[in-house]
Amino acid sequence: MDPVKNCSFTGNHLGIQPHSFVEIVEMLADDCETITGIRPKTPFNEKGHEILFITPSGDVFADPGIYTFMGYLMLFHELDLDYTFSTYASEGGNFGSFTTFNMAKKLNAKMYAEAERLGAKWILGGECGHMWRVINQYMATYNGPAPSCMMDVPTSPITGTKFTNAAATKMVHITEFTADLIKHNKLNLDPSRNDHIITTFHDSCNPARGMGLLEEPRYVLKAVCNNFVEMPENTIREQTFCCGAGSGLNTEEIMELRMRSGMPRGNALRYVQEKYGVNHMACVCAIDRATLPPLADYWAPGVTVSGVHELVANALVMKGECKRTMDLRQEDLPNVTAEAEEE
């Protein structure tokens, strides 16, 4: 119950105070500058922006989610996106959905309340699982309709695309937004920067079965990675397997149970690792980014886990960036290593 209490009182499940939230994001912006030579802007609680961005707090406080968050910062800076963060609605995940209807409704209400307070026209949401189950299936009846006096049907300021699927909730998933950018050739991408990985994609239960978000993440991954491999068809999309540790089961005390319950996903991952040399698995869920690394270490040692937008930022060629020699984890890029060997 502590995560639920923390979300209610301080805005995120870890109970991190607003000033600490700001400091952590600023630190991640510093890391972006180390890698690219460009320090992305980090607007907090600013009124009058078109977009309010809300993401799971695991992307701010936990490895490997922090690299996904750095990807957001770099993408938004490159687009010069008119957006703001909120330190009060600083948790996209709805931990109330694990407890009671009333608590889930209360936590979800903060999204609209902050959008109204800050004057945002629509909300862009980060990579999360149960966050999007609640938004897609329940938000319109929990706390809708959205404040129609000031919120619009989400429209990309970059491409002009109207996200009519979000007309009721006024919220768009980040992979929908990025897939639209790529479709309209609005990003300068160099997928060779991800040539050190052969990646597959884990369909997180809530976005896949609870939302139908199946094609957009794959469209993005194929644009930013030259080496993408699907796991067997009866283990992905609507037939995906659970990570084995969602719904509050991500604790060290039940690690054996987690490894057993995650075995179907681990088995599918090991299959593509042995057959195709897969060494990376992307996903669009913060809980998965926390639970899948130990599962991969156990069932398919050598496979790393990341969010989709970490790989987007690796491939993103930013205007005015320095010569990129490192990926977001500050590890050498493959093309840089090859150039050094040639010299």
What are these regions (language model features)?
Residues 104-107, 186-201, 248-261, 323-343:
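A polyampholytic, Gly/Pro-enriched intrinsically disordered region
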Residues 73-86, 183-187, 196-257:
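Redox- and metal-dependent alpha/beta enzyme cores, enriched for Fe-S-associated oxidoreductases
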Residues 1, 248-262, 290-303:
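Iron-sulfur (Fe-S) cluster-binding segments and ferredoxin-like electron-carrier domains
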Residues 147-191, 233-238, 297-335:
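Short, flexible loop segments at boundaries between secondary-structure elements
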Residues 55-60, 88-98, 102, 106, ...:
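Local cysteine-cluster metal-coordination motifs and their immediate loop/turn environment
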Residues 257-279, 290:
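A short, acidic, amphipathic alpha-helical segment used as a generic capping/interface helix at domain edges
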Residues 1-156, 160, 329-343:
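Iron-sulfur-cluster electron-transfer modules
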Residues 138-144, 221, 292-299:
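Short, aromatic/basic amphipathic alpha-helical patches
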